[in-house]
Amino acid sequence: MSATSTRSSVTRKSSLSKSSSSDKSAKSSSNSSKSPTAASGNKQKMQYTKTRERMVDDVPLPPTHKLTMSEVYDDPKTGKPNFDALRQHFLLEGRIEEAVALRIITEGAALLREEKNMIDVEAPITVCGDIHGQFFDLVKLFEVGGPPATTRYLFLGDYVDRGYFSIECVLYLWSLKITYPTTLSLLRGNHECRHLTEYFTFKQECIIKYSESIYDACMEAFDCLPLAALLNQQFLCIHGGLSPEIFTLDDIKTLNRFREPPAYGPMCDLLWSDPLEDFGNEKTNEFFSHNSVRGCSYFFSYSACCEFLQKNNLLSIVRAHEAQDAGYRMYRKNQVTGFPSLITIFSAPNYLDVYNNKAAVLKYENNVMNIRQFNCSPHPYWLPNFMDVFTWSLPFVGEKVTEMLVNILNICSDDELVAGPDDELEEELRKKIVLVPANASNNNNNNNTPSKPASMSALRKEIIRNKIRAIGKMSRVFSILREESESVLQLKGLTPTGALPVGALSGGRDSLKEALQGLTASSHIHSFAEAKGLDAVNERMPPRRPLLMSASSSSITTVTRSSSSSSNNNNNNSNTSSTTTTKDISNTSSNDTATVTKTSRTTVKSATTSNVRAGFTAKKFP
């Protein structure tokens, strides 16, 4: 709802109130001759003055009742949540009790924790890509892909962030996982982590709709999500892509996934890497190159993909992670098998309400692969950053209140301004008078000596005029703030990033108007490529929190941990080392040790980027 529509509603209300007396008299005089049309018109007018009725009555009011434990877990025999009741309640923007949400999340996490890093799934199955908090499109996805009771599903991650219904997606998918633990599989995406959910919208959404404890429970559950799936022993299904440190499928099985994804390394690559833009038509022979679009991980080439497939006896790699105009993309075929070496699936239609893209799911059955596309579904509107309508309307209310006050004060004439001063005004007058020095008569030749007021009435007039001027200035300031607030919200709504264009605030109102002229309906985003280009900044890994500095500004403290012992379970690393900032590749100690070292900034940077990249950029699979 814009301020324009709000003002028009207020105008209608005021006009109705002004004519209410005349309407009543007309109604009493011509009650017998009143036509049905006039009666319906009066009834329609009166609707605008009823504060308990919704202006847009075709949008149902969200339910205030939160589903209880007995309403969600309504079958004591199965002990499983009623996902149908959850779906219907979430479609109405309803919520559930926090204890119910915690139970769903923890029970789902317990099931995910028991699964391996790479799970085995069999056809027939429906493979789905990114969801990104678009719950109403997730419901449409199940309509297209088939009911979960009779259809196997594999989701490739990115269930949260960017959209405003992320927690509904998590609770609904987790309830399906509890109900169908063997036929519905969930993988981890790059957004299922603390770093991105704090930077984007999921944490804020959890706090607004529930509490921070729900967010913490979700983060623990995300740490349990598997990293990959092997479909029919033919297709490797992951969220991102290949890694220069992963040569075989066994390398995935030995990773420690129960943690926050690091900023580099094989786990990061599985979640963040992308194929080259010119995949299949590369001009270099490098298998991996730095991913400048994401700001982390790598681009992998067609040659790297084909060699990985050949070494692991696979047919293709199925991944998500990148928005696609058609909802999917088939890359260059493998020359050996004649099958696409890489397939990307994206299941969030009209991504961010700006991309205008289709969504797709991949159905694999009887050795036949079908792509089913679908369009977006209507969903309720949320103001940016979950702003409520009262916060949004404060600039408008402030402007109108000060405008009313100025109009009231301007009604007084000059004679009324000096009539009957109150105690506060008298006190202010005394302060004005005592400012005149006592020896003013002895310094008549001193030009700097202030003169006494000509009269009490003139001083009263001047004081009140100054107050009116101050309120008038305040009114103009509120008006400017309200206009700029509307411009900022409009700009955020026109950009896929939800952020203002660079420099939009630097020049004040003029720069905001110029930015709006560049993003008006006449020059709106015309293509998928244009939207993707504007959103590129949000596809990068956000900057991480700065490391703790030591006493010397030229060094930082880092902790390295080396381990040569075998892992406690099949998901931990064996004979590998995990580091917070630097990599320990010596493995000289036979016991677990923690070493504190001081290194320069350049050393840390080279250890985390240059050295790692140089070791694997052109390295082929053994």
Curated annotation (Swiss-Prot):
Protein name per the record: Serine/threonine-protein phosphatase 2B catalytic subunit 1
Biased composition (Low complexity): 1-40, 550-606
Enzyme Commission number(s): 3.1.3.16
Segments carrying motif SAPNY motif: 347-351
Site feature Interaction with PxVP motif in substrate, where: W392
Superkingdom to which the source organism belongs: Eukaryota
Catalytic class of the enzyme: hydrolase
Keywords, comma-separated and alphabetical: Calmodulin-binding, Hydrolase, Iron, Metal-binding, Nitration, Phosphoprotein, Protein phosphatase, Zinc
Keyword Secreted recorded: no
Alphabetized GO MF terms: calcium-dependent protein serine/threonine phosphatase activity; calmodulin binding; calmodulin-dependent protein phosphatase activity; metal ion binding; protein serine/threonine phosphatase activity
Phenotype upon gene inactivation: RNAi-mediated knockdown in neurons reduces activation of phosphatidylinositol 4,5-bisphosphate (PtdIns(4,5)P2) in the synaptic boutons of larval neuromuscular junctions (NMJs), in response to high K+ stimuli that induces activity-dependent bulk endocytosis (ADBE). Under conditions of strong stimuli, the synaptic boutons displays reduced formation of PtdIns(4,5)P2 microdomains at periactive zones and consequently exhibits an impaired Ca2+ response.
BP terms from Gene Ontology: calcineurin-mediated signaling; medium-term memory; mitophagy; negative regulation of epidermal growth factor receptor signaling pathway; regulation of innate immune response; response to Gram-negative bacterium; response to nitric oxide; sleep
InterPro entries from the UniProt entry: Calcineurin-like_PHP_ApaH, Metallo-depent_PP-like, MPP_PP2B, PP2B, Ser/Thr-sp_prot-phosphatase
Phosphoserine, modified sites: S527, S567
SUPFAM superfamilies: Metallo-dependent phosphatases
Gene name tied to this protein: CanA1
Known function: Calcium-dependent, calmodulin-stimulated protein phosphatase which plays an essential role in the transduction of intracellular Ca(2+)-mediated signals. Many of the substrates contain a PxIxIT motif and/or a LxVP motif. This subunit may have a role in the calmodulin activation of calcineurin.
Positions of post-translational 3'-nitrotyrosine modification: Y264
Binding site for Fe cation: D130, H132, D158
Family from the record: Belongs to the PPP phosphatase family. PP-2B subfamily.
